[in-house]
Structure formats: structure tokens, C-alpha cells
Amino acid sequence: MVDPTADDALDATARIARDLIRFDTTNYGEGKSNGEADAAEYVAAHLTRLGLEPEMFESEPGRVSVIARVEGTDRSKPALVVHGHTDVVPAQPDNWSVDPFEGVIKDGMLWGRGAVDMKNMDAMMLTALDDIQVAGKQPARDLVIAFFADEEAGGVLGSHYLVDTHPELFAGATEAISEVGGYSIHLNGARAYLLQTGEKTLVWVKLIARGTAAHGSHLMRDNAVTKLAEAVAAVGRRDWPIRLTDTTSQLLGELARILEVDPQKVGPDELAIATGTASRFIQASLRTTTNPTVLTAGYKHNVIPDTAEALVDIRTLPGEEDAVLAELAELVGPDIEILVLHRDIGLETEFAGPLVEAITGTLNTHDPGAAVLPYLLSGGTDNKALSRLGIKGYGFAPLKLPPEFDFPAMFHGVDERVPLDALVFGRRVLTDLLLNY
């Protein structure tokens, strides 16, 4: 009996993704990171073996991005950027059932930090290029292949750095594909794929409360921790109103049609919930979210600190960020300082055009009859940086998933994993798209 975990039994996509997971490229944020250098050298070596000439760009020591260009048969066509990132968010090993950086193969899945975010797509990019070379073919247009650093901290040292300092790398490109789209969901017994055509605005803020330092036994009304706790509770409990963007309106209309319900009688949240596990993303795309994520205060049990801080991850619908920040100031009150640490734009592009048609056609070739639907991502990607060069970005990392697989829960979650069969599917779909578009 063949061992399904043996190297010769694994698709090359799984082997490469496993190798990449074994590079601990943890990005802790606020400038703290293990760096991407080892992973960057790995992908650069692979690209070199394919006869390409990858360039490595180091924005700060250890923070390395890799870019290569694949020449197409018709260079008059606009180039397509195909990009991934090699950094990952932290993982707490004690919470996992496997070592998050071992790249364990079990239960028909590849486990590890980055298995879906997004070393799976990094691997699919490399094996798709392998397949194109083995076939002795060229893509129809130039491809700009990018492996960015620092996406998990907003891309300041990765995609934004390259857009600022080396925009010529993306010369001639008008469109891009990357993560968090192209994955399947199940609706009314049928499969559909969500193509990401928009992203929410990103605002990361720090709340700072100040008070009076004192002995822990004192009666203290001017307590920084109490002030911060009240502010954090107000922010976290705020239920922001639903507003439908063009993308979300189109998605909900298609969901109502597939589910055979009257959209006038079924609300947006109900339609989102009907998408199953994808509702984690879709419900969040209906409204702004403000989630406190980190609290910092104090240094000893019996000392009242004079400062307390909280980090809040704000994702607004495109165009709402200024109004949300103004309301945030009202929510926390005048005693709380709001420091904006990072801010990036929201995106929304049309669900139409030759690339969307090519994606839909390629998916239908590999999964006949499946619907392809647009959606607004509740998070963000490096497409934000590329948009500054006029490049329209889409989320398309194709994966055909089991109905019960909670894909959104894998992002930044415990026991992150991806089905091996989905990687094989993604490789085939991506290869065909890159060859024929």
C-alpha cells in the first residue's frame, strides 16, 4: 500500500507548500519579524531552475521580496501580475494539535501556518510555471510573478515598498490575481466559487488611556486600565449598520436566485448565513467591523499603571473610513487618545471583463456547471498596493473544497490546513488560466 504522506506520492504543489511552511516566516507586526529571506531564496532558486531571472529586493535586513517576469507570446497584451506573500502570522504551538511549522501531512490535508494564508498559492504559482515549461509553451501575455514580504503587516516592507521604489517591475501590467478568492462553497446542493472583486478599507489604531500611577490598594478614580476597558468594550460592542456595496448587492442577488428565495423577504444576514462557512467573510463584508485585538497595561499586581493601551483592527466598507474614525472618537470619549498606526484603501472592481470571463471559463472547464460569484473580502491583500499603479486586483487562488470544510476559519486560525486534492485542483486551474488568458 502506498503511503500517501511519502514524497513520491505527493503532488509537487503539496511538497513545495510543505517546504515553505517549514520556513518560519512569522511576522509579528510593528517591525518585528523572523523575515522572509530563506523562503525568498527558495522560490528564487525554483524560478532560476525554470530559466527565469528572479530579482530579490530587501527593504530591511531579512525582509525580502522576489520578482520575476515570464515572457508571453503576445507582448502587446497587458501583463498580468500573479502574486503571493511568504510571511505568516504568529502561531501558538500549545494551541495546535500539530507543530505549526512542520508541514504535517495527515487526514488527506497539509497542516501548518501558511497552509491557506498563503503558502498554498505560492506553491501553486511555482508548479503552474513548472507545468507551462514542461508543456513547452508560453503564456499568452507577460506574467509578473511576485512573492512579497510583509503582507501580514500591511505590506509596508513588501508590496508598498516595491511600488514606491521599483514601479518599473510592474510596467505594462493592468490586472493582478492573488489570495482569498476562487474557493468553492456549496449552495442548494450545488457548488459555486467566490471570486474576490473588492476589499474593505484597513485602519489599525492604538487606543491610549492615561491615569495616575499609584499603589494597588488606593482608592483610584483616575485609573488608566478602567478607562481603557470601558473604551474597548464600547468599540467591541458597536454593531455597525449594514450597507451594501455594488459587489455585495450583486452577490446577494445571485445568492437569492440560486437559493430560490425572495431577496425582498430574506435579509442580507440571512442570505450570508446561507453560504455556510463562507458567511464568516460575507457577513463581515456587509458592514464595518471594529475588533479589539491586543491589550497592554501594567507591570505588577499591586501597582496601578499610569498608561493602558489597546490595538483595534478596523475594517470599513470602502469610503466609510473617515466617518468611522469620527464615530470611534465619540465612542471612546475625550480621555482616550487614538493613534492611527496603519491605513490602507478599500477596493472594488467590476465583475466583468476578459479576465473575469477567463476565470469563469477556466473554472467551468474543470468543474462544469459551477457558478462563479463576486464578493467583497472582509480583509485585505497586496492588491491594495498594486492599485496605486492602476492595476486592478482580484482574489483568485482556486481551491475545490469539501462542503464541510470551514475555509475562512483557517485564516490566522489554529490547526490551519488545506486538502491535498484542493491543491491539485488549484494547480491545474491556475496553469490553464495563465496559459490561455
Question: What label would you give each PLM region?
Answer:
Residues 18-25, 48, 52, 130, ...:
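Sec-exported extracytoplasmic/periplasmic mature domains
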Residues 110, 116-194:
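Acidic/histidine-rich catalytic neighborhood of metal-dependent amide-processing enzymes
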